[in-house]
Amino acid sequence: SVTVQNNATLATVDVMVASFIPFIADQLDVAADEVSFDDGRFRADGSNQTPDLLEAAAMARIEGREDLLKHTATATLDARSFPNGAHIAEMEIDPQTGVVECVKYTVTDDFGNLVHPMLVEGQIHGGIAQGLGQAVTERVVYDEDGQLLTASFMDYAMPRADNMPMVKFTNEVIPTTTNPMGMKGCGEAGTVGALAAVTNGVLDAVWEHGIHRVDMPMTPNRVWQMLSQHAVAAE
């Protein structure tokens, strides 16, 4: 989890920097209180040398300071952070075939500060695909002898690119105060939200026809039978 690993890393970096400052001061021939660490580099007034951590580690290795190359720290989170968001899936059903299609998907999340926004958006897209697959296409079938019949991707319908709608994603950043980085994490937010949004979108479409329960996966055959039993005709 980003909230645990990154804050532990940050605590370790603080220990590392504090350990390196006296060494860097000796290397630059300045007093330790003249050395600062800013934007990934050590700096000192009156010196044009600004080694980063990797360069500082190389200098320490040359000088035989192996003690500067290994650091540990403990980070304790006094409270938890909780991401939250809203997912909206616009669903369409073909009554003649039972095919369920997600035509548009909108999601707004609050994950706090992000380390890599593009990767977060990709993770949300992938999670939505997983949730859509579980809700609509993925079905496990066994025969009467317990033999798995959907044992390959020829038979087990994983979601594909053409199953995915256009996804509009926004992240409303409200940094948490429970950790120094202000991060809440995103984890499986895409999957968890998609399952409910897609299923409830289908349920909303058929509710007025007297269908008050739908079961996953909502395969064409299952949906067609459900609609036929309630005499839902094409509109």
Regions found by a protein language model. Name each.
Residues 1-235:
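Cofactor-binding beta-sheet edge motifs in enzyme active sites
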